[in-house]
């Protein structure tokens, strides 16, 4: 085995360990924020939605700058600093008794993610060969699902005693992850050339094909982020206990671990990436439309199963498609900008979803937010269909800029 092949192989194992620590640290805390502050402390869902939206907007919206800085200075210092900032955000969240403290903690957590997320994504593109990326993204997502369940189980158990223990566990995991990266991550450069920050930013912004794709995904993410806000609240409301939320993540893990990789392997040989993304989005949309009209936990979990099936169809294709459109001369900048759709979609999905949930509850129309999200899913599906239509591909709109 050549030194390059050996480095790629060891790098992939490093990425898997790193990813598990990050996923555990995140899911110990974030799925329980809505339970803690809406159900236990009686805050309006809008207040919590704003907090979650701020974290999403800061982390993903500023990701292009984090990626551009990583292109210039390398991955390691950005990742270690960002993970320590995320731990600090969790520490602040532990003492949040006013909305502004929760907002501050989420902003700090988001700033940490701004620093570590784009270089981590760029390392995947650097270390995994193009023909292997779809399968590797599938493995990462299976790991995400397993980590989500373990994290949510740990967080739910700790929440019975004290929310401060939940935040402490999350902070400890991110500190451990920072130490792991500081000790084991080589001083790798992300791009094929040492790209100045301004040049990396400009290269992305001139790529009309990539910019259009990223912004189109805003609607997709408005649906996807509800696993952190409205779905846990719905499960808790119908079940009458926050302990039921862990079963939602158990469903996700079961579906992901049993179906994600086989579906990805089967579909990558038969369908184009954009068609897989659109098919998954359509399934997610159909699952969301009737959620507000469900009255039993069995019905709700059935729809959640369908939603997760759509997600595992779409997610590997979305990640692989984004990576395939990136320019190797500015990987960090591209991976940072690719998070902008999640920034906008997350902020709108959290804040808008929280507001719609409160408004629907106040007027006795609990189905309102879910119907609105379903409409957004349909619009996004049509936008993707338009973007990847044969006529637009033939016109050069989807061709790389030179």
From Swiss-Prot:
Specify whether Transmembrane helix is a keyword of the entry: yes
Q: How does it sit in the membrane?
A: Multi-pass membrane protein
Q: Which residues cross the membrane?
A: 13-33, 34-54, 99-116, 139-159, 165-185, 214-234, 243-263, 277-297, 300-320, 340-360, 369-389
Q: One Pfam family for this entry, by name?
A: MFS_1
Do you know which CDD domains this protein is assigned to?
MFS_MdtH_MDR_like
Main localization, broad class: membrane
Which SUPFAM superfamilies does the record match to this protein?
Answer: MFS general substrate transporter (SSF103473)
Which InterPro entries does the UniProt entry name for this protein?
MFS, MFS_dom, MFS_trans_sf, MFS_Transporters, Multidrug-R_MdtH
A cellular component term, taken from the record's GO annotations: plasma membrane
Q: Which UniProt keywords apply?
A: Cell inner membrane, Cell membrane, Membrane, Transmembrane, Transmembrane helix, Transport
Subcellular localization, as worded in the UniProt entry = Cell inner membrane
Looking at the record's lineage, which domain of life comes first? Bacteria
The GO terms describing molecular function are:
transmembrane transporter activity
KW Ion transport (keyword) present: no
Q: Which family, according to UniProt?
A: Belongs to the major facilitator superfamily. DHA1 family. MdtH (TC 2.A.1.2.21) subfamily.
Q: What is this protein called?
A: Multidrug resistance protein MdtH
